[in-house]
Amino acid sequence: MEKLNKESESDPKNNGPFTQVYQKGWERIRELSKDKQGVVAIPLYSFLAEHIDPSCGAVVADQQFLADKLGVSRSTIKRWLNYLESKNALVRIPVAGKVCAYALDPHEVWKGYNTSKNYAAFVTKTLVNKDGDIQRRIMAMFSN
């Protein structure tokens, strides 16, 4: 992960080490802040926003990895994911076994080029690029 962040910082085309948050993204944060379930799910939403892959707007990880990173149980992550999915804040795309891609709305948060938003995993519900090829370069996060 550190290597990925250093590569992003050194290549100005990758928008550096920041995530763009749009008006709709700030509205999402305010919406999540309105109820108890939303408030506790904000750390997961912000972690995903911070680590989305610029090419597809998703994080590929297993739930245990997310739990370890956020210092909570896997069942808490599962509860937060279900809540965020029910609020249309993220799309869950099964990858293999317990590993999923978690995609955020590119009109809320984004790291890549503006022209690639139409091919974001949140929009297409799959990991593809603008040529229709399955995205194989995506950074995967695992607990092992």
Regions found by a protein language model. Give the residues of each.
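Short recognition helix of helix-turn-helix/winged-helix DNA-binding domains
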Residues: 1-58, 64, 141-144
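Winged-helix/helix-turn-helix nucleic-acid-interaction surface
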Residues: 2-5, 79-144
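Alpha-helical interaction segments
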Residues: 7-16, 35, 70, 92, ...
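Alpha-helical structural elements
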Residues: 13, 17, 21, 40-42, ...
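Winged helix-turn-helix DNA-binding recognition segment
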Residues: 34, 38-40, 50-108
